[in-house]
Amino acid sequence: MEKAYKILSVQENISHKKAKALIDSGLVSIGGKKLMVARKELPKNTHFSVQKVEKPSVIFEDENILALFKPPFIESYDLASFFKGWALLHRLDKETSGVVLLVKENSEFHLKAKKAFKDRAVKKEYLALTQGIIEEEREINAPILTFKTTKAFSKISKKGQEAVTIITPLKIINKKTLLKVGIKTGRTHQIRVHLKHINHPIIGDTLYNNEPSLAKRLMLHAHKIALLGYEFEAIAPKEFEI
């Protein structure tokens, strides 16, 4: 028996540090099941599958704003390293794909954009693939309390902040529902926590969904965003085509 990251480092001919990072990023699986613990003891002949990570791509750019497609498994904070001179305006969870906006730091437009977020004048639309059948549009209004340690975790609590999510079913197949999701507030993990709250967790959500899944990622995609006269759309990856 040997620690998983050490076996992976030999298989991929990479350092132990890189092997740990791949596992921690959710990119390594065994027999279709995601490996969650880098130090897990496994047989030395274990074979891993390592998922490749796409690079971010430009959707739109002008003197004010840069709209990017963020693939899953890239930290939002790392996007600025790909595009020098731009500052991150908002963020998506690591495994969430979709449109992310950057602006010129401390520019006049940057200040206006930050105010738009603060005033809830930004319209966002997501796609989520969830467990179970949801047949009607509904509003989920449940306060969310977030704990921030090494990793953020949120839950429904009367002590939490107001959180409102609107879901609309787009397609139902094999006891799964593809949802259009709108949010009136922007709490940490809001969509993920609200969908768990109504017993329809997002497929592939290893934090809030205990059901096993063959999905290689969290099935949540930031589809559209609009603010200050701009509107952008990131086409959903093929895994959302059910």
Curated annotation (Swiss-Prot):
Keywords: Isomerase, RNA-binding. GO terms for biological process: enzyme-directed rRNA pseudouridine synthesis. It catalyses: a uridine in RNA = a pseudouridine in RNA. InterPro entries: PsdUridine_synth_cat_dom_sf, PsdUridine_synth_RluA-like_CS, PsdUridine_synth_RsuA/RluA, RluA_PseudoU_synthase. Its EC number is 5.4.99.-. It is an enzyme of class 5 (isomerase). The active site is at D93. Belongs to the pseudouridine synthase RluA family. This is Uncharacterized RNA pseudouridine synthase HP_0956.
